[in-house]
Amino acid sequence: MENLTVNAVVDNLDEVTGFVLKRLDNYGCSKKTLMQIRLAVEEIFVTIASYAFDPSVGPAEVRCEVMQDPLRVVIQFLDGGRPFDPLAKEDADTSADALFSRDGGLGILLVKETMDGVSYSYENGKNILTIEKKLKDTEEACL
């Protein structure tokens, strides 16, 4: 698995998304699949940058690997910030009135609904959030 370590600050978002998307260059992914992966990466990294170490700054590691059978990308986000399982919270309410509330949770709901797998663990003092997206097994994924 290739990895990138950066300070968990929003200013590093472009570097993180570029790192992930570059690994998909040779797989002919559809625009839809790339956008779903990009949005998931952005949501997760911005959440880490905003809350993991607040008010200080710490490192975040992003690991990315394209796997075979089925063809898919596995992306892991690791940080040593305070323990936080974004999957433990009940899914956000998507009714019209709730969309204007500040309860949060819409971002992780988007990740859960667009990725094929999402898991969280806390090991050796690190939050580890793993997302997985199939690259060829769906009609619109990759050509």
Question: For each of these PLM feature ranges, what is it?
Answer:
Residues 1-4, 8-10, 112-143:
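Flexible, glycine-/charge-rich segments associated with ATP-binding catalytic modules
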Residues 2-31:
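Helix-loop-beta hinge of the Bergerat
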Residues 20-42, 100-102:
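Conserved short strand/loop->alpha-helix "switch" segment adjacent to the catalytic nucleotide/phosphoryl-transfer site
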Residues 43-47, 113:
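Conserved polar catalytic motif of the HATPase_c/GHKL fold
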Residues 52-57:
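A short, flexible helix-to-loop-to-beta junction within the catalytic ATP-binding CA
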Residues 58-66:
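A conserved short beta-strand within the histidine kinase catalytic ATPase domain
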Residues 71-103:
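Glycine-rich/acidic phosphate-handling loop/turn and adjacent ATP-lid/helix
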Residues 99-115:
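Glycine-rich phosphate-binding loop
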